[in-house]
Amino acid sequence: MAAMTYHLNVVSAESRMFEGLVQKIQVTGSEGELGIYPGHAPLLTAIKPGMVRIVKQFGEEEVIYLSGGILEVQPSGVIVLADTAIRGKDLDEAKALESKRKAEEHIRNSHGDVDYAQASAELSKAIAKLRVIELTKKAM
């Protein structure tokens, strides 16, 4: 028996990252982790910086880094509108480690709520990139 699927589009301001049939996706919404399967109730939510893990029609997996965005689930399909989206294989580990180091230093030297919030957001993005790199390496 064939797996149930739905149509997924992952797009950013720069490009269309993925379009096709999937069994499920996993993404971090504003209220926590979301697993979207065929027949999911309609939903509109903000996406936190992190990753979208895609299980394609025939079971292959792909991981894409998202800097944030919007997730829309409708009966006709699912759309991920990302601010920035980068395939795991295209991320630069050295740059991500350097971004993480700079954000940690910025947090230590922050002198106010705004500085701390900005540095914390940058740290979250760097950690998310490193996690996507790690998962992409494991899949290879």
From Swiss-Prot:
Matches recorded under InterPro entries: ATP_F1_dsu/esu_C_sf, ATP_synth_F1_dsu/esu, ATP_synth_F1_dsu/esu_N, ATP_synth_F1_esu_C, ATPsynth_dsu/esu_N
Q: Name one GO cellular component term.
A: proton-transporting ATP synthase complex
Question: What keyword terms does UniProt attach to this protein?
Answer: ATP synthesis, Cell inner membrane, Cell membrane, CF(1), Hydrogen ion transport, Ion transport, Membrane, Transport
UniProt superkingdom: Bacteria
- Listed SUPFAM superfamilies: Epsilon subunit of F1F0-ATP synthase C-terminal domain, Epsilon subunit of F1F0-ATP synthase N-terminal domain
Picking any one GO molecular function of the record gives:
proton-transporting ATP synthase activity, rotational mechanism
Q: Where in the cell is it found?
A: Cell inner membrane
Quaternary structure, from the entry: F-type ATPases have 2 components, CF(1) - the catalytic core - and CF(0) - the membrane proton channel. CF(1) has five subunits: alpha(3), beta(3), gamma(1), delta(1), epsilon(1). CF(0) has three main subunits: a, b and c.
Protein name per Swiss-Prot or TrEMBL: ATP synthase epsilon chain
